[in-house]
Amino acid sequence: MEFLLFLVLLIINPVVLCGLLVLFFSYLRRIKNERKYFRTAINNDFFEGRYYIKNALKFGFLNSIITMLLGVELTKQWIFVYMGIMAVGIILSFYVDLNSILLLVFTGGTIGIASLSLFDEKMVIPASLQSFAEIKPGIIFLILTVFYLTKLSMLKSYKQDFFQPKIYNGKRGRRLIRYSLRDQTVLPLIVLVPGNLIHSLIPVWPILSLGGQSFTLFVLPLWISWTLKLWRNSVEMELQKAKADTQQKLVITIIGTILGLWFPITGIFVFIILLLLVGLRFVQRYAKMKRKGKWYAETHDGIRVVAVRPETPAAKMNLEIGDVIIMCNRIHVTTESEFYEALQKNSAYCKLKIRTYEGQLKLAESAIFADSPHEIGVVLFR
């Protein structure tokens, strides 16, 4: 019965529903843009929603075990303010991803308020902020640890199918492609809230008694999102850099959790280190955007692979975005029409000569079945 109530609370949680709704509208926008630029939807599947629910249940369950074992305690005022801020952030995520900024500002503010009373016990904290001052810095760092740990786990499942292409006009008349990945989920984290917050509304909801104090189990919706953009970098390199960056932040939050629980006064200093790392990575990324590199651009020495539709002959041949098809069935191709004509030379089999984004040559081949899509699933410049 209690487990069913947990599932009901997860499903009707407004933040979870808001995230799923925004993700659905983002899916509709993706399909619209793909049909606008390429006259076809690259992937009609609403995979965003499937991964949203899958990640929420899997990582929510695993991380809830951690929060329950460590007895994560949050005040109801903190939770409600957090839920309101994250709900606004999720709505705005249709246009801009503010997930990390909002979380760092909110958690940093909480650690700052808690640190005021730690540095000066005589300092009077306003009544409206008292519930924030009661939260230990180590608990806040634990939430950040769950945040970065989940982001790192989500990152490992990403592949080129998740990156969406968009066409831009270059300065020299060539058309360029920018790839972007946007993904999000909301984890249902079980935390402890002093008092009978839910029990007063749902009498059968369990209450825990620890140290002579009553606690209510509450599901905290932890919003987690990813936004990655590619201009002049390969998918593999971008994912590797994002992984290394997230691992560094994760290490800092783990250290902050340990020190914050045993030596709360150190929390503000560890958080400053985290902010410095975030700022440094932002500056480095901006500086890199100004450097020279290979664009995903239209070419006259073959045809550029803009995207690969899943479960097609092109996907079976392991074609990657940025590849340049030089030959098809031993015929040189430089335009879409030439590529299509070369495919007609052998309607049952296709053999390609390809130059990768890094400049290496490779061969790829695959059988073509009767139900294979036009142009074997390769999306080209139109």
Mark where each language-model region is.
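N-terminal signal-anchor module of multipass membrane proteins
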Residues: 1-68
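Structural signature of hydrophobic alpha-helical transmembrane segments
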Residues: 11-26, 67-84, 135-145, 209-219
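Membrane-helix interface "capping/anchor" motifs
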Residues: 91-105, 230-240
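Generic multipass alpha-helical transmembrane bundles of integral membrane proteins
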Residues: 112-235
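Interdomain regulatory linker/hinge segments that flank or connect interaction modules
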Residues: 207, 225-288
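PDZ/PDZ-like groove recognition
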Residues: 282-316
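Conserved PDZ fold ligand-binding element
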Residues: 314-336
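PDZ-domain C-terminal substructure recognizer with occasional recognition of PDZ-binding tails
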Residues: 338-382
